[in-house]
A protein has these predicted regions:
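Nucleotide-activated chemistry modules centered on ATP-dependent adenylation/adenylyltransferase
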Residues: 1-233
Length: 233
């Protein structure tokens, strides 16, 4: 698992308490790879005017409802996850050896996220077991709970602009230290890019009119996630 250095703190707490011991019981090696050891970019990417995360932007104005009219393309999953995992494996196993035999990368993308599937061949071959088995996110969570484990938290960065209102509210109410970091992060990025925001509302996160969906977004608003297919490796 790639640690983007901004992963929601309750995710790693869950991984440490439940997933790591489970892997030990199954004799499966479990690794968390720090992004900063292998990534070539952090927030600022190759284009200094376009940071890697898909922040909302008012650069071209706002719509009739006063919301940000645009959203940045998302490259953070490629730079912080895909390339980090690949460089780690090349260094550990040998680039030539991996090129010769190929690597299967299992992606934790559920069947309702099929549009994010990217079929690949060659050295890095992506597999989508949940899609192949027609497993939805709700079903996957139920499997975990039926095994006797607590409901797993959503895995995404605390500053990820792809969070819907429900996820922002969950973090604000249940992981307030992460919400505070996200508010500070928004202020930091606006020192460099004052037209960017973490939410579509285009106001400081602490003041955003976040509204619960009442269960409407129980599957998360999958449409707004990036197309790279790399958020869940």
């Amino acid at each position: 698992m790639s640690n983007t250095m901004r992963e929601a703190s309750n995710v790693f707490e869950y991984q440490k308490e439940y997933i790591s011991p489970l892997c030990d019981d199954m004799d499966v090696e479990y690794q968390i790879i720090d992004k900063d050891r292998y990534a070539t970019y952090d927030i600022c990417g190759p284009d200094p005017e376009s940071p890697l995360p898909g922040y909302f932007t008012e650069y071209n104005g706002r719509d009739k409802n006063g919301l940000c009219a645009g959203k940045q393309p998302t490259f953070c999953s490629d730079k912080w996850k895909k390339e980090v995992v690949q460089r780690y494996l090349n260094g550990r196993c040998g680039e030539d050896e991996l090129t010769k035999r190929g690597v299967e990368m299992w992606m934790g993308i559920s069947v309702e996220e099929t549009r994010r599937v990217r079929l690949t061949g060659g050295k890095w071959n992506r597999r989508y077991p949940l899609v192949d088995m027609m497993i939805t996110k709700t079903m996957a969570i139920q499997f975990v709970e039926d095994y006797g484990l607590p409901t797993p938290p959503a895995s995404l960065c605390w500053m990820c602009p792809n969070r819907d209102d429900d996820l922002w509210l969950y973090m604000k109410n249940n992981v307030p230290e992460d919400f505070k970091k996200a508010c500070e992060h928004e202020k930091e990025i606006q020192m460099e890019w004052p037209w960017l925001w973490l939410t579509k509302y285009g106001v400081p996160l602490a003041e955003a009119p976040l509204t619960p969906s009442g269960g409407k977004h129980a599957q998360m608003d999958l449409v707004q996630f990036c197309d790279s297919g790399m958020c869940f490796v």
